[in-house]
Amino acid sequence: GFQTETLYLSGTGLGDEKALEILSKVKQELKLHICTDIHSPEEAEIAVKVADIVQVPAFLCRQTDLLIAAGKTGKFVNIKKGQFLSPESMKFATEKILSTGNKNIMLTERGTTFGYNDLVIDFRGIPKMKTFGFPVVLDVTHSLQQPNQSSGVTGGQPEMIEYMAKAGLAVG
């Protein structure tokens, strides 16, 4: 899949087939596992050709058809918690994946909306999501985003990465 940026001049990516060609080459040459976003059930079918992990983006984490399609791939599914969602609500997303018979699930904490142009990490969410029985990942860089800036481009606080990563490690 491709990531659409806020500012229309940022572009929308290479296209699915070209992107998968590049990911396949990276996978083969560097012997890496590949994780890629999917944005529609149809993209799940395409991504499974190369991806070891299909990732459901935060803004789409409640989309039943997408979650079920991701689960049906049989691959690991990483569900990024929406900035608008409580950690407890992620249980419903995992149940949709589990309904397909796929138990290969990971959850990602990536921050919670704090006002209009900021995100914060509520570290209590990590142990809460761990109670579902799946690994929880902390996406430090996304949690430090400052979306919807007046420039039309997402900003952030890269100088805080080290501190948030250490805090995430402390929480587990």
Predicted regions and their residues:
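Catalytic alpha/beta core domains of metabolic enzymes, predominantly
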Residues: G71-G172
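Glycine-rich, proline-tolerant flexible connector loops at the mouths of alpha/beta enzymes
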Residues: G1-E17
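Aromatic/hydrophobic pocket-lining residues that form the small-molecule binding cavity
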Residues: D16-L23, Q63, M90, I161
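Short secondary-structure capping/turn micro-motifs that flank functional sites
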Residues: T4-E5, E42-A44, R62-Q63, S86-P87, ...
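Conserved structured catalytic cores and adjacent interaction surfaces
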Residues: A47
